[in-house]
Regions:
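Long, aromatic- and glycine/proline-rich binding clefts that accommodate carbohydrate-like moieties
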Residues: 31, 303-307, 353-406, 410, ...
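Extracytoplasmic "Venus flytrap"/periplasmic binding protein-like
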Residues: 50-136, 175-179, 272, 276-280, ...
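Extracytoplasmic/periplasmic solute-binding protein
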Residues: 138-159, 164, 185-235, 278
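Glycine-centered hinge/linker elements that transmit conformational signals in sensory
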Residues: 189-195, 232-262, 304, 308
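Short, well-ordered beta-strand elements
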Residues: 31-42, 61-66, 89-90, 155
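Short, polar/charged alpha-helical segment
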Residues: 25-26, 42-63, 404, 422
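Hinge/lid segment of periplasmic solute-binding proteins
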Residues: 23-29, 98-162, 304, 372
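Short, solvent-exposed loop/beta-turn-alpha elements that line the ligand-binding surface or hinge
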Residues: 29, 111-133, 208, 225-245, ...
């Protein structure tokens, strides 16, 4: 049974300039349609709920939302997308699901929708979409199979996309005479020096729980420290010197972090920072608003924002969520209209003003947004370093990701030798890639 929240019962968000009504114009054929959408329980999509009533008011299209924790959402979609008649007209998907859904032909190529003059808004301005997000979230079939290129196609639009930034306690840094780290040497020094100077205070709060969270945490450091999971011919390079440095960095951060760090997911790590248990937090831009909410955060008013520190290169995370239309959707054209509306300039700004993550350059440049959320300018600048090849979004990634996550947890909690751990991952990954056919042409 779906848990459905009708958009007509939610609090209305900011008003839009009406471009069409349900009685006339492009939305008229779809007035009275009810779309069922699947969204994650996530700060961005909480903001979306506030603006959905305006979509219904403008278009006459009702929206019912099935909201689930994002890993549970992935499990539900894995089932629904295989059915002849699915429950969902529009889905939000985690970035690493892109390869699976495209490879299984479970989501629509968006070209036919953007070619239809009855559907596409001539003022949509796709060039304003943040290109790193669009490449990472939406494009498949190009370079390496998951990046843009001459053979690539668009299957989704970024919505709730994220990059990584560093949050830090301005009061703690001022008291200790520190500046926010711009490089990894300084970051790792501060991560352990701060707890030594202020007993009871962790250095960096980080996700590290066994499985996906430990893998994600490792990847946060692998890219800036110069590493990749594979080279350009799919040879595993995770066990390179750069991979070892990334694992060592994560272990240092967890060892010098707040109590219980090795079991933290992103919410637990963010909460540790919000409750004053850590001086830094390196993770998604999605957490910023919560740190300034005095009802949930003891550090409100004492939080600074900086770009993800650089190693041998500046390479922050690209990830988060996108929107796609399932192949088995009952109302694909109306779903496209909702997708287009939410990711339009007006829609993106409305969601951002409600606390969501912008997907457009123009939104980050908006004066009203920057006045309301002063961290927006820093986050906009950080996008220059967002790495669309931050992780390999291939069909085999789910199994590789799980292996990295469980093995990295052993490094963090059982002191498994780092080189031995990474060599094991590389060996198992090569066997998997052989099985998947990646070396058959070599």
């Amino acid at each position: 049974m779906l848990k459905l929240l009708s958009s007509t019962t939610m609090v209305a968000g900011m008003a839009f300039a009406t471009v069409a009504t349900a009685q006339e114009g492009p939305y008229a054929p779809y007035a009275g349609t009810t779309l069922v959408v699947n969204f994650p329980a996530h700060p961005h999509y909480n903001a979306v709920l506030e603006v959905l009533p305006e979509f219904t008011a403008q278009t006459g299209i009702e929206v019912e939302v099935d909201m689930l924790p994002y890993l549970d959402m992935r499990e539900r979609q894995t089932l629904e997308l295989t059915l002849d008649e699915g429950a969902y007209d529009l889905i939000s998907y985690v970035v690493f699901s892109k390869a699976d859904y495209v490879f299984a032909d479970q989501i629509h190529n968006l070209a036919p929708f953007f070619m239809n003059p009855r559907l596409v808004d001539p003022n949509y301005d796709p060039e304003d979409l943040i290109d790193g997000y669009l490449q990472n979230i939406g494009v498949a079939g190009g370079e390496k199979g998951y990046l843009p290129g001459p053979t690539g196609s668009l299957f989704g639009l970024p919505f709730g996309s994220e990059t990584s930034v560093m949050y830090y306690r301005t009061d703690v840094f001022e008291e200790l005479g520190l500046e926010p780290a711009q490089d990894y040497a300084t970051l790792l020094d501060q991560a352990c020096a701060i707890p030594a100077a202020m007993p009871g205070m962790g250095g960096v709060a980080s996700r590290a729980a066994s499985g996906h969270q430990a893998s994600h945490a490792f990847l946060l450091h692998l890219a800036p420290l110069g590493g990749r999971v594979f080279d350009d011919t799919w040879n595993p390079t995770i066990n390179s010197a750069e991979g070892v440095a990334a694992a060592e960095a994560l272990k240092t951060i967890v060892d010098c972090g707040p109590e219980g760090s090795s079991a933290f997911g992103p919410s637990e790590a963010a909460n540790a920072f919000a409750q004053g248990q850590a001086a830094m937090f390196i993770d998604s831009i999605a957490f910023a608003a919560g740190f300034e909410d005095e009802s949930r955060s003891t550090v409100a008013g004492n939080v600074g924002w900086a770009s993800h520190p650089a190693g041998v290169r500046a390479a922050s995370q690209t990830g988060g969520f996108g929107l796609a239309i399932p192949r088995n959707a009952e109302h694909p054209e109306a779903a496209f209209l909702l997708m287009q509306w939410l990711t339009s300039k007006q829609g993106d700004l409305a969601v951002a003003l409600a606390g969501g993550n912008p997907s457009r350059f123009s939104t980050y440049a908006n004066a009203e947004l920057n006045a309301k959320f002063p961290w927006s300018a820093t986050f906009g600048e950080a996008l220059a370093d967002a790495d669309p090849d931050w992780r390999p979004i291939i069909p085999a990634w789910g199994r590789i990701n799980a292996d990295i996550g469980t093995t990295m947890s052993q490094v963090l909690t059982e002191d498994l030798d780092i080189q031995e751990a990474l060599d094991g991952i590389a060996e198992r990954t090569r066997a998997l890639m052989t099985e998947e056919g990646y070396y058959i042409w070599q």
